[in-house]
Amino acid sequence: MKPSRFSQAFRPLMAAACAALMLSSCSSLSYYSQAAQGQLELLTDSRPIDDWIADPHTSVKLRHRLETARQIRRYAIQEMKLPDNGSYSNYTHLKRPYVLWNVVATPELSLKPVQWCFPVAGCVNYRGYYSKAEAQAFARDLRAKGHDVEVGGVPAYSTLGWFSDPLISTFINYPDAQLARMLFHELAHQVTYVPGDSQFNESFANAVEEAGVEGWLERFGNPMMRDAYDRYAARKKDFLALLLKYRGELDRTYKSMVPTARSGWPRRACSWP
């Protein structure tokens, strides 16, 4: 008997989850449990793009977005030689704005993020939750320890080829060029991923996405699409420059602050711009 789509998705997921559990402490069991459950729901709730397009109940807007995504995926495989697997051949509709919420934390008066280590992915500067409430609860625990914490929504992520990542409602309505950028980026992670080296992994994926979008726009874009993407890229570049500027200023401020022996709080208050 041919295994069902559910069992095909379930068995490798459970194998990965079991391996993770064996390598983790008891305090991590609930975290891995929510991760396995969230990934399983994402896979089992997906349907092939062709089914959605053929379904008379699918809106005209969604049908158009799925057709665009299918064309982008075809370009990624045929022209960019990115992995030709089940990724982005299915679509999942979620009743929430993000697929994940990442928790990022730094110790008090530090810009060096706390790291968490996982099987396969290695050590990363974030911890993801499929539930916003669970992410916020974990963030509260970190703040109670004196950490600076941020909880941010994530529209997409890559399972690095372990599973067939679906298109998701959290990003399907991105403008065409930004949707292409997203898919090229996530597929690039399936090509090269060094566990524990987020800077290299993101730099590689960014290089692939930028080259891919340029080629895709040349083939399928129009002046309006090109102008919109150029403005998006410029805003992204300006925002990154702003972050780096204030990161440098904040780093200098932190280094100039001397904690008191009694409370640990700085003797001199921060001087914010």
Show where each model-derived region lies:
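Pan-zinc metallopeptidase signature
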Residues: 244-273
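Acidic/His-rich structured neighborhood in mature extracellular/periplasmic domains
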Residues: 71-237
